[in-house]
A protein has these predicted regions:
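Beta-sheet-dominated interaction scaffolds and their linkers
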Residues: 21-48, 54, 125-129
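Hydrophobic core residues within well-ordered beta-strands of beta-rich domains
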Residues: 45-47, 86, 102, 117
Length: 129
C-alpha cells in the first residue's frame, strides 16, 4: 500500500514539474548603441533598443533606470506575450554637458529568467563652432 502511495505521489510531482511553464526571457537585438559624433548645437539624440520575449510566459519590464539624469529611457509598459516584440527608447540630452566622449548605461529589470540586463549608449559630442 505504501509503495502505491509513494508511486502516486511521484507521478503527481513529475506531472506538475512537466506542466510548469518556463519563465519569460528577454532577448535584445543589440545591447550597445553608438551615436558616433554629433555637435553640441544639436545635443539631444535618441535610439531604440528592440527586444523579443523568447520565453513561454508573458514578459513584464518592471524598471528601466539610466545611470545619469541626462539619459531617459521609455519602455513598453504592457506585458509582452511569448514571441512578441517590445522596445526601449533611450534619449541622451547633452545640453549643458562638456563636449567629449560619453558612455551611459540603462539597467533593465524584468520578471524574466534573467532579471537584469544592462544596455549601453555612447558617443562623442563635439564643441559648437
Amino acid at each position: 500500500m505504501k509503495k502505491i502511495l509513494v508511486l502516486t505521489m511521484l507521478l503527481f510531482c513529475g506531472m506538475s514539474v512537466a506542466m510548469a511553464q518556463k519563465p519569460a526571457e528577454i532577448k535584445f537585438d543589440k545591447l550597445t548603441h553608438d551615436f558616433g559624433t554629433f555637435s553640441e548645437k544639436a545635443p539631444v539624440v535618441s535610439c531604440t533598443f528592440y527586444f523579443t520575449n523568447v520565453g513561454e510566459s508573458p514578459l513584464v519590464i518592471n524598471q528601466a533606470v539610466a545611470s545619469c539624469g541626462c539619459t531617459v529611457p521609455e519602455y513598453t509598459k504592457t506585458p509582452i506575450q511569448p514571441g512578441e516584440k517590445g522596445e526601449i527608447k533611450v534619449t541622451y540630452n547633452g545640453t549643458g554637458k562638456f563636449p567629449g566622449h560619453f558612455k551611459k548605461s540603462i539597467t533593465v529589470r524584468t520578471n524574466g529568467a534573467v532579471e537584469m540586463t544592462r544596455l549601453y549608449i555612447e558617443g562623442e559630442m563635439t564643441e559648437a563652432k
